[in-house]
Amino acid sequence: MRFLCLHGYAFSVEVLQQQMEPITAHLPSDWEYEFLEAGMEPTQLMLPNLKQVPKPNSSWYNFPYPEDVEEAYERLAAYVESEGPFDGIWGFSQGGSMAALLLLMHQAEHPDTPYPFKMAIFTSAFLPHSFDNGVISWDLTEKNTLEPAYLPGRIDVSHGKKLDWKKDLHTSIEYDMINAVKDELDFPVDLLLRWRPSDIPEKIPVPSVHVRGLKDHYSFVDESVYELFDPDMARKMTHRGGHNFPRYNEELVHFAELIIETVVSLH
């Protein structure tokens, strides 16, 4: 098995390798893991404690400006095309979001061709942003509050209804982020919406493993990525930690069992 591994926001290949070592020690020794550096410089506006994060580090993108997300996606897709084939993709945090985006885009653009991966593994992953759902244009009012305007894309997720974009699950995360740093941004800003499981016409038919911590401090790390996938082909577990890999031996063993069961199901 050969896996493409994607790190999270303000992470590095080296840090992800270190975090994966306890779990890969429980997997077959002849499996291969290839790591891709994200490439964009993180910003303190997204991560206030960035100065304490070990360097080097990088992100796939910062705020979901359409051009930045598209650049990250195209770079990843080009890498898979040139360096593949890979048997699986394994994404942590924002890397998991990018892995899900890659599969969703394949489903949308090449529905009648084989997926680029036989399986996918997600650790502490969250929903990716969509190129099809349009953008929210956020602007500041005279009262220094954020006002959203929805510009639909190929898909109108509002279905003609007036939605509270400050609370809607497509956009609430981004609202909270930019509202916290609105005095340091230039407005207006146009940001992509996130995919929701209800947005896709059918579940992704790729065997998958989903792992998250019960103490994850990011509320948006939930079951949503799991819900994008065919439940008959998906396996999931939780562990006692937070926004990281399982650390207790019995949890690592269970994680490894889920991965191996998924690999066996491919044959």
UniProtKB/Swiss-Prot annotation:
Record's Gene Ontology CC terms?
A: cytoplasm; nucleus
Catalytic center at which residues? S93 (charge relay system), D183 (charge relay system), H243 (charge relay system)
Provide the coiled-coil residue spans.
none
Query: What is the native source organism of this protein?
Result: Gibberella moniliformis (strain M3125 / FGSC 7600)
Catalytic EC class:
hydrolase
Cysteine pairings via disulfide bonds = none
Phylogenetic classification of the source organism: Eukaryota, Fungi, Dikarya, Ascomycota, Pezizomycotina
Q: What does this protein do?
A: Hydrolase; part of the gene cluster that mediates the biosynthesis of fusaric acid, a mycotoxin with low to moderate toxicity to animals and humans, but with high phytotoxic properties. L-aspartate is suggested as fusaric acid amino acid precursor that is activated and further processed to O-acetyl-L-homoserine by cluster enzymes aspartate kinase FUB3 and homoserine O-acetyltransferase FUB5, as well as enzymes of the primary metabolism.
Quote the Gene3D superfamilies the UniProt record gives.
alpha/beta hydrolase (3.40.50.1820)
Q: What happens when the gene is disrupted?
A: Impairs the production of fusaric acid.
Assigned EC number: 3.1.-.-
Describe the applications of the protein.
Fusaric acid is phytotoxic to plants such as cotton and banana. It has been shown to induce programmed cell death in plants. In addition to a mild toxicity to animals, fusaric acid exhibits acanthamoebicidal, antioomycete, and antimycobacterial activities.
**A Gene Ontology molecular function term of the record:** hydrolase activity
Its name, as the record gives it, is: Hydrolase FUB4
